UniProtKB/Swiss-Prot annotation:
The keyword Phosphoprotein does not apply. One of its GO terms (cellular component) is mitochondrial outer membrane. GO terms for biological process: intracellular iron ion homeostasis; mitochondrial transport; regulation of autophagy. This is CDGSH iron-sulfur domain-containing protein 2 homolog. It holds the Pfam family zf-CDGSH. It comes from Drosophila erecta (Fruit fly). The gene is Cisd2. [2Fe-2S] cluster binds at C100, C102, C111, H115. Binds 1 [2Fe-2S] cluster. Keywords: 2Fe-2S, Endoplasmic reticulum, Iron, Iron-sulfur, Membrane, Metal-binding, Transmembrane, Transmembrane helix. The keyword Membrane applies.
Length: 133
């Protein structure tokens, strides 16, 4: 706890008081190159904190960093049908069958492992539903 106390009570105030912040608008034009370089780190920190707060609290910003989400699960399989329904008779299943739940498979309705790449890209944990006889 003592290092944090020293940082907050001594180091940070000393650093901030040593920054070359002018008293007037005209003073900004009189800053040297070295003074401008000294102002870069706190400016980057303030901008980063502001941007992080913007992303966290502004709903419009949350979709701008990642792909726009349409809310759809199925972006590929039988789009011409109003509802995708597959009926599979349990007697037709030999020992077990894996069915897709991620809508990424090329072998619909069976799972071909496409969810693995989807999980790596998005951090998701979707997998197939496995039916055993």
């Amino acid at each position: 706890m003592e290092p944090i106390s020293h940082l907050v009570k001594s180091s940070l105030p000393n650093y901030l008081s040593s920054l070359p912040i002018p008293d007037s608008i005209g003073g900004w034009f009189k800053l040297s190159f070295k003074d401008w370089l000294a102002l870069i780190p706190p400016t980057v920190v303030v901008a980063g904190l502001g941007y992080t707060a913007y992303l966290a609290y502004c709903p419009a910003a949350q979709g701008s960093c990642s792909a726009k989400k349409s809310g759809r699960c199925n972006n590929l399989i039988r789009k011409n049908e109003p509802k995708v329904v597959d009926m599979i008779d349990v007697e037709d299943i030999a020992e077990k069958a894996a069915f897709c739940r991620c809508w990424k498979t090329k072998n619909w309705p069976y799972c071909d492992g496409s969810h693995g790449e989807h999980n790596k890209q998005t951090g998701d944990n979707v997998g197939p539903i496995v039916i055993k006889k």
